[in-house]
């Protein structure tokens, strides 16, 4: 079966790791403008080893301790320093995480207050536009009905004015109900 990828085929022919690296470097030098992939090592915070349950090489007396025991002291000191550094790094990381969390919460509260203000303004403008539209509609109907009433006899004008007032009240009730429905839907979203 023929293999499609010539690069992997070439890398399989490498006799050793140095040959493989040499081939890859040669390939990179052929196309020098292309950026080389450089893996970035992530700095992970690893906990130090747990202390041993039973320590075998305990130095009994400082009077008898000579230069032979110094390497034991040095290793113990290094382990303790690593442990303290780890504790400090964890504390610093937690502090930074808390600061970030508080900053995010503060920004969310500010954004929420801004959107609430804009939502209220938008609803006020919407309600005002509906009122204007309703009053304009009522004014047009009043004008057309006044023209009709002028041509008709004056006996039915009282009943017509009462009917107009009733329709205006009903229209206002409808508008208020629609506004409350709109507010409820916007609050729920």
Swiss-Prot record:
Q: Compositionally biased, Acidic residues: which spans?
A: 141-151, 178-189
Renumbered to this chain, region (Disordered) spans 105-189
| GO molecular function terms attached to this record | double-stranded RNA binding; protein kinase binding; protein kinase inhibitor activity
Compositionally biased intervals (Basic and acidic residues): 105-115, 161-177
Question: Per the record, GO CC terms?
Answer: nucleolus
Signal peptide positions are none
Cystine crosslinks: none
Q: Where is the composition biased (Basic residues)?
A: 116-136
Q: Which InterPro entries does the UniProt record give?
A: Prkrip1
Listed name of the protein? Uncharacterized protein F37A4.2
């Amino acid at each position: 079966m023929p293999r499609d990828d010539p690069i992997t085929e070439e890398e399989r022919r490498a006799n050793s790791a140095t040959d493989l690296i040499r081939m890859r470097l040669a390939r990179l030098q052929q196309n020098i403008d292309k950026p080389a992939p450089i893996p970035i090592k992530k700095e992970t915070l690893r906990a130090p080893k747990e202390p041993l349950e039973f320590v075998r090489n305990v130095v009994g007396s400082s009077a008898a301790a000579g230069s032979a025991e110094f390497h034991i002291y040095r290793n113990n000191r290094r382990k303790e320093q690593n442990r303290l550094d780890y504790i400090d790094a964890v504390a610093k990381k937690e502090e930074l995480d808390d600061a970030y969390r508080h900053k995010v919460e503060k920004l969310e509260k500010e954004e929420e207050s801004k959107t609430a203000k804009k939502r209220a303004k938008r609803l006020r403008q919407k309600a005002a536009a509906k009122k204007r539209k309703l009053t304009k509609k009522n004014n047009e109907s009043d004008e057309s009905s006044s023209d009709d009433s002028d041509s008709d006899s004056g006996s039915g004008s009282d009943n017509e004015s009462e009917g107009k007032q009733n329709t205006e009240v009903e229209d206002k009730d409808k508008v208020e109900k629609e506004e409350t429905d709109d507010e409820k839907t916007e609050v729920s979203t």
